[in-house]
Amino acid sequence: MYVNITNLGYKQGGSTITQQLAKLIFFNAEKSIIRKVRELFITFKLEALLDKEEILSLYLNRAYFGAGNYGIKSAANSYFNIDPYDLSIYESAILVSALKAPSRLNMMSSPILTKKRASLVLNKMLSLGLITKLEFEDQSFKLESFKL
């Protein structure tokens, strides 16, 4: 936001999950300073009313995952034919990897790039202590073995 204001225009993204949620719910994809300021006010309101889990849940239930899939339920069903609660760690990494650029980083349009990005997600999960080394190795093997 600072870069955008100091350059008097829209130069960079870098939105938080809450800002992305605000944009999904209230605004279109128009890139303007006015939209970003409005988005910022909505973001503050969302963060005051909801906890992080609620914000993440709302975001994942509305986000675009590529190949016509809006929301984690649609994506899990379309890509893996399962409910989101049944996703494995590597399947979750595949879906999360699509969020950066869903039209380009999804299993249908770019399976090799999707696997590379999902591998980065698994590495990040390991470095943050969200999964153990054993889980990382197991899920990385399953990811590499998975036919996209």
Q: What name fits each language-model region?
A:
Residues G14:
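PIN/NYN-family metal-dependent endoribonuclease catalytic core
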